[in-house]
Amino acid sequence: MNFWQTTQFPYSWNHRGVTVPWSGSDHEISYRNNIERDLWQNIDISYTYNAHGFRTDELTKHLGQPVDLALGCSLTEGIGVPLKDAWPSIVAEQRSVPMLNLGIQSASTDTVARILTNCIGLFDIQHVFILWPDMARFELYNKDRIESVIPT
């Protein structure tokens, strides 16, 4: 599979079409071990992923329409915060077109470039907002999936 084609829905290694209570580095063990967990007791965080694995509207809803794109890693996806508090949601409040949050936890600069390439021709892209991931990260391409590599 060519993961770098234009007019192709971007690949995500996230859950697809579900709502889950934990995701990625936000998991129950880290919550239990957090000495400040009491500060989070009244904050509802869940992760609703669309059919393509992104924490945003269904992509098919916006085909051919004007949109802004937000790209990046877990900070863009909003891991550990309610979706309304993720930076793409805050920027979207000041914009006149829908913002598609295409951030993926563990993303690399490869991921950002690949997803942007995929979106060309799918949407009428107005602006692209990027919070660049660490430059040491990269993607490995397999026949039917992509792996994110984060060197230690």
Residue positions per predicted region:
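N-terminal secretory targeting modules
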Residues: 1-69, 122-126, 131-152
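Serine-esterase "nucleophile elbow" of acetyl-processing enzymes
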Residues: 50-110, 115-120
